[in-house]
């Protein structure tokens, strides 16, 4: 009886240990998967697909079904992108621009012996107020994507169908720097812009999906 109880206790301890090890292994796998996507390098690549379509298929199936299918798949990730953009990307972006402004004026003051007249002249000559946001831009952020169908016929006539989808990274917010209002990616969130033309001839078309950045 004692030996039986001892075996039961050993088996229970072994099962607990196996469960603990399984949890640890599972947690490591989950963490590894998360770190892969968090630390994954961002890149952009154009995808090109060449196919022949007749007039009816081009005007109905390809435009109305395939492009919508692509957009629907991409829009699934919009809530995640918006959440991260609003809380993390925007905060980091604004903080870096403020730090750059502090360094900018500090260097101007130090290099001109606190001469206000020289400070103003140096600033006006070196920096253009219209382009200052481009000079302060340090990172590239995804603003959306565009789907383009472009083809050329035997008589040298071309047809291009383009669908542009934009998602505002900074959620349509304005920020003030150096007594001027600058728009940071001032794009309406989840706004669709379509430029579609009816294709009335048969031909070969190139389908290209491009990611748009600022």
Swiss-Prot record:
Organism: Vanderwaltozyma polyspora (strain ATCC 22028 / DSM 70294 / BCRC 21397 / CBS 2163 / NBRC 10782 / NRRL Y-8283 / UCD 57-17) (Kluyveromyces polysporus)
InterPro entries on file: Ribosomal_uS3m_fun (IPR007980)
UniProt keyword Transcription, yes or no: no
Location(s), subcellular: Mitochondrion
Role: Essential for mitochondrial protein synthesis and required for the maturation of small ribosomal subunits.
Name recorded for this polypeptide: Small ribosomal subunit protein uS3m
GO BP: translation
Keywords: Mitochondrion, Ribonucleoprotein, Ribosomal protein
Similarity remark: Belongs to the universal ribosomal protein uS3 family.
GO cellular component, one term: ribonucleoprotein complex
MF GO annotations: structural constituent of ribosome
Main location: mitochondrion
């Amino acid at each position: 009886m004692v030996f039986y109880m001892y075996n039961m206790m050993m088996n229970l301890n072994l099962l607990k240990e196996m469960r603990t090890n399984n949890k640890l292994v599972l947690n490591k796998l989950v963490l590894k998967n998360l770190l892969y996507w968090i630390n994954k390098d961002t890149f952009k690549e154009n995808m090109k697909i060449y196919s022949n379509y007749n007039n009816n298929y081009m005007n109905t199936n390809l435009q109305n079904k395939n492009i919508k299918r692509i957009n629907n798949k991409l829009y699934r990730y919009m809530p995640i992108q918006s959440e991260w953009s609003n809380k993390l990307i925007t905060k980091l972006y604004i903080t870096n621009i403020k730090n750059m402004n502090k360094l900018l004026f500090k260097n101007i003051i130090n290099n001109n012996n606190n001469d206000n007249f020289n400070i103003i002249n140096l600033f006006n000559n070196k920096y253009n107020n219209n382009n200052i946001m481009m000079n302060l831009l340090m990172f590239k952020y995804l603003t959306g994507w565009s789907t383009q169908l472009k083809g050329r016929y035997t008589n040298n006539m071309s047809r291009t169908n383009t669908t542009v989808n934009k998602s505002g990274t900074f959620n349509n917010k304005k920020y003030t720097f150096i007594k001027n209002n600058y728009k940071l990616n001032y794009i309406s969130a989840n706004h669709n812009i379509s430029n579609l033309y009816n294709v009335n001839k048969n031909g070969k078309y190139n389908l290209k999906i491009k990611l748009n950045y600022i």
